[in-house]
Swiss-Prot record:
Gene: dxs
Gene3D superfamilies xref list: 3.40.50.920, 3.40.50.970
Cofactors that this protein relies on: Mg(2+); thiamine diphosphate
Family matches, as Pfam families: DXP_synthase_N (PF13292), Transket_pyr (PF02779), Transketolase_C (PF02780)
A single Gene Ontology CC term: cytosol
Oligomer and partners: Homodimer.
Keyword set, alphabetical order: Isoprene biosynthesis, Magnesium, Metal-binding, Thiamine biosynthesis, Thiamine pyrophosphate, Transferase
Protein name: 1-deoxy-D-xylulose-5-phosphate synthase
Organism: Vibrio atlanticus (strain LGP32)
Cofactor descriptive note: Binds 1 Mg(2+) ion per subunit.
Length: 627
């Protein structure tokens, strides 16, 4: 539903940045107010990421006001905070479609707009990309400005510091803006810092500082005195000199909600030479009190009524797989003090809030540091503990070398609880958990499990925790099937599946067996009822139940594998590899995710589109048998 733009008269004048730059400066505060209200009213009707964007309204307006976008390049890290950017770059009337099938992409996306310089979704990539753009801008000699905007969470990742270390070394012109919403700043401190920012970024101070460095460079004691004096001056209000040690000229912190002061500072910094670092303080959820009080809860929101002070609760009586995992952690920790749970900044999403409160000494949030998370688990395992790394499928990609080098080679008892495996829905290409089976299946020593329901998930987590080597349990986003959950733990026999439905002779004379890996089992059973097929819940992707595969191959004419993973290199590919190794030549149909990046949509919409619901599975099998 598109909002009535006549209710936002100043915003109506700023459809694109070139329109924005024509507005008088005295109207920009009103523009920010209208932009924030528009964002709140739109996202509350459509769902999406809210709190981050509410906090970056003034920054977004200031950036597009000062810089000549899209010629000058803005690089947004992750992109949760880029909704105001989308509104101001010609996509205002489509904001209500964001994160929906065929709608606006949830993050900045190059195919969507010339103002989106980098397609993003994972964190901490912006400084590296911006530096690459800055290097090329210098090469082409067109005086193109490049700006990276990164949050205080994303900047903790090693990749961000690697990029800053390189930028400081080669001294290219670029600006990194740290959007720090961890704390609020008082009016006095904010005013003092805003004034200091004007001084430190101004041309007079810059020329004096650079000139003084040249004059005094041959007099080490005086040079050191000047340096220390400058640091003491800045140290009164600047939180440290770490960024300057990396080679950046640090300015800030400044109030990120004063649009006119931001514009002054950005104009001063725009033409400074070398790598610049602007530290701004913002409030996540700014302007909407419930989001200010609960920025985590309002980070990503369903449809809601802004007039109410709370978000609607889920109406499903079925637990999510994330909750199944969280309950397992608490129940298992009560029995095993050696259990250690690690997450790279995904406490809420991974279902670990309760565990973090009940077992704080066994809980470790390492921030956005997937590589460190995996190798931290390595150290714990070497010391005799039983670590569990709770991680989204898409983010495990970032710790792949550590999975091989630091865990699997040493055959250490580290379990990976892989959430959001398969299609996650609204977050699109960057977040679909499409590849974990493919990239883990080739690793020696790994045990890989794919539960068909929530009870099987619980027992597989226990199985992995008891295993003496590396293991992984991968499960999807969302609710379970409503299966009864047994409270007691039962370890599964590793590498053993089960037949859950036996077929009789099919109507066309061909006997079909469906080998289901994961939560498609319910759809497989619906299909089997329609075509009279055998169904096996394979449970283990590695090691495969080779005896069961041999049995199914001997008793059936066609095998069908189904998984919520890329077909290339996935579980079905493993079945074919085994059959070929045993010289068991027979027709095998692999169903799963196609060889393309899957865009956003609801999980049900995507399953239907890809032919992975019961109706689509039946059609694929019928078409295959008809060949």
């Amino acid at each position: 539903m598109t909002l009535d733009i006549s209710k936002y008269p100043t915003l109506a004048l700023a459809d694109k940045p070139e329109d924005l730059r024509l507005l008088p400066k005295e109207t920009l505060t009103q523009l920010c107010d209208e932009l924030r209200t528009y964002l709140l009213n739109s996202v509350s009707q459509s769902s999406g990421h809210l709190a981050s964007g509410l906090g970056t309204v003034e920054l977004t307006v200031a950036l597009h006001y000062v810089y000549n976008t899209p010629f000058d390049q803005l690089v947004w890290d992750v992109g949760h905070q880029a909704y105001p950017h989308k509104i101001l770059t010609g996509r205002r009337d489509r904001l209500s479609t964001i994160r929906q099938k065929d709608g606006l992409h949830p993050f900045p996306w190059r195919e969507e707009s010339e103002y989106d310089t980098l397609s993003v979704g994972h964190s901490s990539t912006s400084i590296s990309a911006a530096l690459g753009m800055a290097i090329s801008a210098k090469k082409e000699g067109k005086n193109r400005k490049v700006v990276s905007v990164i949050g205080d969470g994303a900047i903790t990742a090693g990749m961000a510091f690697e990029a800053m270390n390189h930028a400081g070394d080669i001294h290219n012109d670029m600006l990194v803006i740290l959007n720090d919403n961890e704390m609020s700043i008082s009016e006095n401190v904010g005013a003092l810092n805003n004034h200091l920012a004007q001084v430190l970024s101004g041309s007079l101070y810059t020329s004096i500082r650079e000139g003084g460095k040249k004059v005094l460079s041959g007099v080490p004691p005086i040079k050191e005195l000047v340096r220390r004096t400058e640091e003491h001056l800045k140290g009164m209000v600047v939180p440290g000199t770490m960024f300057e040690e990396l080679g950046f000229n640090y300015i800030g912190p400044v109030d990120g909600h004063d649009v006119n002061e931001l514009i002054k500072t950005l104009k001063n910094m725009r033409d400074l030479k070398g790598p610049q670092f602007l530290h701004i303080m913002t409030k996540k959820g700014k302007g909407y009190e419930p989001a200010e009080k609960d920025p985590i809860g309002y980070h990503g929101v369903p449809k809601f009524d802004p007039a109410h002070s709370s978000l609607p609760k889920s109406t499903s009586s079925k637990p999510t797989f994330s909750k199944i995992f969280g309950d397992f952690l608490c129940d298992m920790a009560a029995q095993d003090p050696k259990l250690m749970a690690i997450t790279p900044a995904m406490r809420e999403g991974s279902g670990m809030v309760r565990f973090s409160k009940e077992y704080p000494k066994q809980y470790f949030d390492v921030a956005i540091a997937e590589q460190h998370a995996v190798t931290l688990a390595t150290g714990m395992a070497i010391a005799g503990d039983k670590p569990i790394v709770a991680i989204y499928s898409t983010f495990l990609q970032r710790g792949y070398d550590q999975l091989i080098h630091d865990v699997a080679i040493m055959d250490l008892p580290v379990m990976f609880a892989i959430d959001r495996a398969g299609l996650v829905g609204a977050d699109g290409q960057t977040h679909q958990g499409a590849f974990d089976l493919s990239f883990m299946r080739c690793i020696p020593n790994m045990v890989i499990m794919a539960p068909s329901d929530e009870n099987e998930c619980r027992q597989m987590l226990y199985t992995g925790h008891q295993h003496t080597g590396p293991s992984a349990v991968r499960y999807p986003r969302g609710n379970g099937m409503g299966t009864e959950i047994q409270s007691e733990f039962t370890a599964l026999e590793i590498g053993k599946g089960r037949i859950v439905r036996e077929s009789k002779k099919a109507k066309d004379g061909s006997k079909v067996a469906i080998l289901s890996f994961g939560t498609f089992l319910e759809s497989a059973l619906q299909t089997a009822d329609a075509i009279d097929a055998t169904v096996a819940d394979m449970r283990f992707v590695k090691p495969l139940d080779e005896a069961l595969i041999k049995q199914l191959a001997a008793d059936h004419d066609v095998l069908v594998t189904i998984e919520e993973n890329a077909i290339a290199g996935g579980a079905g590919a493993g079945v074919i590899e085994f059959l070929m190794q045993e010289k068991l030549l027979m027709p095998v149909l692999n169903l799963g995710l196609p060889d393309k990046f899957i865009a956003q949509g609801t999980q049900d919409e995507l399953h239907e589109e890809l032919g992975l619901d019961a109706k689509g599975i039946e059609k694929s099998i019928s078409d295959y048998l008809a060949k």
